[in-house]
Amino acid sequence: MAVLRPFDKLPELNSATILLVGAEGGPQQQLAEAMLREKKDFNINIHLASSLPLPSERDHLRPRIDLIAFVIDIKSKYSLKNVQASLAYVDVRFFLGKVCFLVTGVGRANNCSVEMNAIWKLGEDYCSPVIFCELELEGIRVATAQRLLRMLQICAGRVPGVSALYFSLLMRNSAGD
């Protein structure tokens, strides 16, 4: 069972890779398609996984992962438990600005199975931003795709003067401070 490491491979020229983990099915796939449709000046690789660890037999073919977005469906406790279990397979150096938690289904608060405090605690414990969205709505899905692409661009080192760690600190929740 391989642990994902952020700097174990060299970066590819004019390219960035994002790994979307969790919340199997339509919303994750639709988000990936929305990201691919956006105009960008670099190549993007999107890998989808329902959980970690990733299979090790194709590890030598997998590009360097610049950003991991853990997708949590607020309607499913299994989704949160799956993400929590997957976090054990991520090297701690990824949490220096290269991880975010994407919480979907927030438009249906009455169907909520996951406590919001658990999600906020996850973001605090792993020093990673928590992004709330509704992937079933086209406009919000496009806005989320644009936001993830900008984060990916920063995490891949394609924005001069801005590091992933610095950007992550800017996105942290300051309500508790």
UniProtKB/Swiss-Prot annotation:
Q: Which UniProt keywords apply?
A: Centromere, Chromosome, Nucleus
Location(s) in or outside the cell:
Nucleus; Chromosome, Centromere
Q: What does it do?
A: Component of the CENPA-HI complex, a centromeric complex involved in assembly of kinetochore proteins, mitotic progression and chromosome segregation.
Per UniProt, what is one Pfam family of this protein? CENP-M
Q: Which Gene3D superfamilies is this protein grouped with?
A: P-loop containing nucleotide triphosphate hydrolases
| Subunit and partners | Component of the CENPA-HI complex, at least composed of CENPH, CENPI, CENPK, CENPL, CENPM, CENPO and CENPP.
Q: Name one GO cellular component term.
A: nucleus
Taxonomy, superkingdom? Eukaryota
User: What protein name is recorded for this chain?
Assistant: Centromere protein M
- InterPro entries from the xrefs? Centromere_Cenp-M, P-loop_NTPase
